[in-house]
């Protein structure tokens, strides 16, 4: 989504209600994260946990979407990214509701004994690949520090019985993630396949799992319409966030 109509800060991304600086983060604000933050179910949510928070994008989006008494905890391993996420939260309208912690999620415990109705993560995609220019980028891109089995285990330790654990992944990796999650006792409850247009195959999948079994609702979202304009579905989902939508 272009932000070129006005002179906006160049070290991040300006949304309607907040700004995300991301120049000190390995992974920048992108469509995947924005889709996930806008899509995750929030009915009945009182506590949100963002695993691998990066710049704090998801924590900020969920703070905007939820009631004034909802607490959002964001955990990020990388020191620089966690510091920037904390600064972004402090500069937002919801600074009193967002707590950013620099920690390894495997060792982290919430400041209060609680479980979360919503856990959200935009996790590393790939098991291995071409070495990255920095260890920070490698940590964000590859599952070397947070593999998917460990992520599912961590989420299970912190979620309520009726809660949802939501991720966004490439379709092929998402299908493998579903198999792994199912084998570990999770139940897929929501699935949205995301394609660039109606005529193209999906390239991303939004997934919501729960410890509790129930019907699984599946649908499809095209980002653009036949004339390359943003589709009605994409606009309805993300319109509260994109500045010029």
From Swiss-Prot:
GO cellular component, one term: cytoplasm
SUPFAM superfamilies: S-adenosyl-L-methionine-dependent methyltransferases
Cross-referenced InterPro entries: DNA_methylase_N6_adenine_CS, SAM-dependent_MTases_sf, Small_mtfrase_dom, tRNA_Adenine-N(6)_MTase, tRNA_adenine-N6_MeTrfase
Recorded catalytic activity of this chain's protein: adenosine(37) in tRNA1(Val) + S-adenosyl-L-methionine = N(6)-methyladenosine(37) in tRNA1(Val) + S-adenosyl-L-homocysteine + H(+)
The enzyme's E.C. designation: 2.1.1.223
Keywords, ordered alphabetically: Cytoplasm, Methyltransferase, S-adenosyl-L-methionine, Transferase, tRNA processing
One Pfam family hit: MTS
Subcellular location: Cytoplasm
Tree of life domain: Bacteria
Gene Ontology biological process terms from the UniProt entry: methylation; tRNA processing
Example GO molecular function: tRNA (adenine-N6)-methyltransferase activity
Family, similarity comment: Belongs to the methyltransferase superfamily. tRNA (adenine-N(6)-)-methyltransferase family.
PANTHER family: TRNA1(VAL) (ADENINE(37)-N6)-METHYLTRANSFERASE
Purpose: Specifically methylates the adenine in position 37 of tRNA(1)(Val) (anticodon cmo5UAC).
Name of the protein in its database record: tRNA1(Val) (adenine(37)-N6)-methyltransferase
Organism: Klebsiella pneumoniae (strain 342)
């Amino acid at each position: 989504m272009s932000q070129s109509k006005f002179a906006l800060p160049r070290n991040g991304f300006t949304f309607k209600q907040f700004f995300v600086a991301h120049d000190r983060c390995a992974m920048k604000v992108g469509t995947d994260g924005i889709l996930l933050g806008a899509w995750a179910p929030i009915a009945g949510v009182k506590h949100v946990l963002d695993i691998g928070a990066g710049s704090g994008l998801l924590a900020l989006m969920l703070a905007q979407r939820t009631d004034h008494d909802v607490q959002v905890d964001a955990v990020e391993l990388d020191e620089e990214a966690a510091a920037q996420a904390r600064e972004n939260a402090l500069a937002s309208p919801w600074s009193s509701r967002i707590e950013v912690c620099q920690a390894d999620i495997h060792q982290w415990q919430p400041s209060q004994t609680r479980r979360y109705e919503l856990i959200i993560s935009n996790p590393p995609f790939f098991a291995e690949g071409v070495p990255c220019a920095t260890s920070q980028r490698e940590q964000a891109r590859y599952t070397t520090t947070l593999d998917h089995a460990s992520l599912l285990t961590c989420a299970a330790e912190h979620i309520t019985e009726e809660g949802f654990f939501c991720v966004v992944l490439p379709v092929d990796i998402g299908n493998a993630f579903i198999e792994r999650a199912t084998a570990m006792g999770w139940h897929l409850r929501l699935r949205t396949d995301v394609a660039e247009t109606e005529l193209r195959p999906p390239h991303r999948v939004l997934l919501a799992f729960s410890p509790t079994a129930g019907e699984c609702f599946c649908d499809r979202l095209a980002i653009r319409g036949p004339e390359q304009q943003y589709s009605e579905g994409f606009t309805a989902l993300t319109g509260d966030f994109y500045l010029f939508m």
